[in-house]
C-alpha cells in the first residue's frame, strides 16, 4: 500500500514524523483529505484537528493554524502551536474561550479585538477537537 511522509512541526519542536495512508486537516477554505500522490498544494491551515491515519493507527493532533504544504509523497504542517490531541487540557480551553468572549464583549479601547477573535476561534477549535476525540473513543 502506498504511503505519504508526514511532518507536523510547531514553533518549538517537531511533534510528529512518520508515514500515513491518509491525512485530514482543516485548510483555510475547508476540509482537506490528503492521500499519497495528491496534487501539490500550499494553503493556510485553520485552527483545528489534524488526523494522521495509517493501517495500524490513527493519531489526532491540534494545530492552532499555520500552513500545510502537500507534495505527492510528503505532507509538511507548520503551526505556531501543535500538540497531541490526547494531551489537550479541556479546563484550560474552556477558560481561554471564556476569557476571549469576555474580551470581545468588553468596551475598553485597549482591547485588541482581532487578537481576541483569533483567541476565541482557537479556543473553540481546541474544545471541538477534544469533543471529537471523546466521541470516537
Model-found features: residue ranges?
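N-terminal export/targeting signal detector
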Residues: 1-5
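Compact, glycine-rich, soluble single-domain proteins
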Residues: 7-99
